[in-house]
Curated annotation (Swiss-Prot):
<feature type="active site" description="Proton acceptor">
    <location>
        <position position="246"/>
    </location>
</feature>
<comment type="similarity">
    <text>Belongs to the SELO family.</text>
</comment>
<keyword id="KW-0479">Metal-binding</keyword>
<feature type="binding site">
    <location>
        <position position="107"/>
    </location>
    <ligand>
        <name>ATP</name>
    </ligand>
</feature>
<keyword id="KW-0547">Nucleotide-binding</keyword>
<dbReference type="GO" id="GO:0070733">
    <property type="term" value="F:AMPylase activity"/>
</dbReference>
<feature type="binding site">
    <location>
        <position position="247"/>
    </location>
    <ligand>
        <name>Mg(2+)</name>
    </ligand>
</feature>
<feature type="binding site">
    <location>
        <position position="256"/>
    </location>
    <ligand>
        <name>Mg(2+)</name>
    </ligand>
</feature>
<dbReference type="InterPro" id="IPR054838">
    <property type="entry name" value="adnlytase_SelO"/>
</dbReference>
<protein>
    <recommendedName>
        <fullName>Protein nucleotidyltransferase YdiU</fullName>
        <ecNumber>2.7.7.-</ecNumber>
        <ecNumber>2.7.7.108</ecNumber>
    </recommendedName>
</protein>
<feature type="binding site">
    <location>
        <position position="87"/>
    </location>
    <ligand>
        <name>ATP</name>
    </ligand>
</feature>
<feature type="binding site">
    <location>
        <position position="119"/>
    </location>
    <ligand>
        <name>ATP</name>
    </ligand>
</feature>
<keyword id="KW-0808">Transferase</keyword>
<keyword id="KW-0067">ATP-binding</keyword>
<feature type="binding site">
    <location>
        <position position="256"/>
    </location>
    <ligand>
        <name>ATP</name>
    </ligand>
</feature>
<feature type="binding site">
    <location>
        <position position="170"/>
    </location>
    <ligand>
        <name>ATP</name>
    </ligand>
</feature>
<dbReference type="GO" id="GO:0000287">
    <property type="term" value="F:magnesium ion binding"/>
</dbReference>
Amino acid sequence: MTLSFVTRWRDELPETYTALSPTPLNNARLIWHNTELANTLSIPSSLFKNGAGVWGGEALLPGMSPLAQVYSGHQFGVWAGQLGDGRGILLGEQLLADGTTMDWHLKGAGLTPYSRMGDGRAVLRSTIRESLASEAMHYLGIPTTRALSIVTSDSPVYRETAEPGAMLMRVAPSHLRFGHFEHFYYRRESEKVRQLADFAIRHYWSHLEDDEDKYRLWFSDVVARTASLIAQWQTVGFAHGVMNTDNMSLLGLTLDYGPFGFLDDYEPGFICNHSDHQGRYSFDNQPAVALWNLQRLAQTLSPFVAVDALNEALDSYQQVLLTHYGQRMRQKLGFMTEQKEDNALLNELFSLMARERSDYTRTFRMLSLTEQHSAASPLRDEFIDRAAFDDWFARYRGRLQQDEVSDSERQQLMQSVNPALVLRNWLAQRAIEAAEKGDMMELHRLHEALRNPFSDRDDDYVSRPPDWGKRLEVSCSS
């Protein structure tokens, strides 16, 4: 089958990019590809059998028209000016059978005009982390970019130490970022901001294109998508680590996996990025930061959208987030209905978990085994203060009995939303260290395991992290 590519971005937004081709690595070789995703995208298996090829930037497929995008943004709350694709190149937009498109974005593809002081490269460590994280999030049901392939090489790339140069093929319906809009707003080119909005509506919100109120309705949906995404992050214990405006997806996708981390111990103020000295992007601050980022996006639209309309959309953010968060947390607790005491029970559980540094994922998974008429719980042994747990658990069982559903029905629901497996940093690190020594088996095993996060397991993928794996420091270097 021949793949078809379109050039919408190149043709319709000519001032938002520089056309250029990838710069190949030395002795590049494909070490992993996403068979399931490739099948979904109707990519012929033969493309993965002919060396690095397109996956390593050594060849282009017919119809591809590679380019690096320019955007700007606020980083750690401070205006950073022009940024852009410093190491990534959008190879093309694949046209799918249903008429939608999928960006092919090659990360680590070499120098671009937007590399600033960087070398345009990515290292094997960061490409493995992003591939694992994006696929883990996808199978958790959270909107995200996807990973299609990883190529490693003999080209050294210098970060804290010399590391193998690598490339990741990332795919997504769009790479539109808040930062695209900021770039032209701060250049006082509001008509180009409008062109970006029109492009987004035309291709991703086409049902609004002929509505005279399209900009308000579109921005309201961007707010809703962002609120829903952040709510989902919070329910699975995911910390992004670097929520700069240029890393915010207009479509509400999880974008740009860098120093991310899933909670091990329940620590509301968890900081996964060791460069985040002030804790701006801590786990519990993510909802507020996302709203701040939306406010920056709204500012770029103010030349052609009424400020009252923008503020009305922004005002809806908190309620949308709380609604999505509340619904999912009730499911995680096994509540089939909404009762007034639900929030208190959840907050008391969080207080217990925070005091005892309980494992976030394991706590909710073990809670899924609760039998409402039995005071016994395997979760009890996870707490030192048994009296406090017993008090909470008795009230929790009483609440379960209000819903009048069977244990098996409730447990099935809880186990479908409380994963047994999340991508803990130590699991990723173990796969990285093996891969850097030439052993790709753990990378493939972990990818396969992450496809079934809600299935019971009895291996170390679902255990507490070992001592060496706790609080691994992760930086932005990639």
